[in-house]
Amino acid sequence: MLRQFLFSTASRRLVRPMIAPHRSASSSLDKTEFTTPSQIVDYDDPPHLPVPEYPLRPDEPLETRKQRLLYQSRKRGMLENDLLLSTFVAKHLRDFSAAQTAQYDDLINGVSNDWDIFYWATETKPTPPQYDTEIMRMLKQHVKNEERVQRIRQPDL
């Protein structure tokens, strides 16, 4: 199945660089077309990739949950979210109620693709209703960075 995917046209579209010039068969030699990021952002996940369900932790103490969320916010696997979420958590997490902490936990662990969180927070894509919560609105406000705080590294622990 993997071999079929690797040699399919869908995989070639995924691997093509974001702003790489390419020529179509109908174009002349002096005319070059460019692929824009918006054409690449919206690829659907292949149906053969199962996404495991995140395990719920109903009996987890609030302080333990906050410590786990602090760690998970700093270790996302993509620098953009590492910076946004770690600075957001450093600013707000200690003041979150149990309900707000649960909303934040659902946001960062319920979504299977970190790029979705990034696009929703930067308002590149509309936020689905189930994630359009008070915490998401706070995150969007944080991302706007109206105080013009420099966020080039994660805050100290």
UniProtKB/Swiss-Prot annotation:
Plays an essential role in the assembly of succinate dehydrogenase (SDH), an enzyme complex (also referred to as respiratory complex II) that is a component of both the tricarboxylic acid (TCA) cycle and the mitochondrial electron transport chain, and which couples the oxidation of succinate to fumarate with the reduction of ubiquinone (coenzyme Q) to ubiquinol. Required for flavinylation (covalent attachment of FAD) of the flavoprotein subunit of the SDH catalytic dimer. GO terms for cellular component: mitochondrial matrix; mitochondrion. Keywords: Chaperone, Mitochondrion, Transit peptide. This is Succinate dehydrogenase assembly factor 2-B, mitochondrial. GO terms for biological process: mitochondrial electron transport, succinate to ubiquinone; mitochondrial respiratory chain complex II assembly; protein-FAD linkage; tricarboxylic acid cycle. Coiled coil: none annotated. HAMAP family: SDHAF2 (MF_03057). Disulfide bonds: none annotated. Its main location: mitochondrion. Residues 1-24 form a transit peptide. The keyword Mitochondrion applies. Belongs to the SDHAF2 family. It is found in: Mitochondrion matrix. It comes from Drosophila persimilis. Interacts with the flavoprotein subunit within the SDH catalytic dimer.
